[in-house]
Amino acid sequence: WYARVLGIKVEPWGVVFTPDAAAAHPGAATVFSPFKADTDYFEPSDKELMFNLMVDDLDGILARCAEHGVEPVKTFPDEANGRFAHIMDPEGRKIELW
């Protein structure tokens, strides 16, 4: 699903390597952002975590998702940090596209 819908290259054994991500995408970062146990930010997911993926073209990836029947569960107005949208993976995990 992640390869087909989001275009993420997944190795045959299920791992995603991005050793050159910083060089390919200046300004990209790995962010670890713990939330309080009682947060509702992950809803409608009941999972304990969510992925936040920085993308080069939010409109383009949302169009790609729509081609595969995946519609955003939430979109946000533009803000200082960029544009965001939330989608759900088939296992019910929320993905924040940024």
Pin down the residues of each PLM region.
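A generic fold-level signal
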Residues: 27, 45-46, 79
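Short linear motifs in intrinsically disordered
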Residues: 5-9, 52-56, 74-77
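Short hydrophobic-acidic sequence motifs that mark active-site Asp/Glu residues
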Residues: 31, 50, 94
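Core segments of cupin and vicinal oxygen chelate
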Residues: 1-31
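Vicinal oxygen chelate
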Residues: 13, 39-98
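Short secondary-structure boundary/capping segments
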Residues: 22-24, 40-43, 76
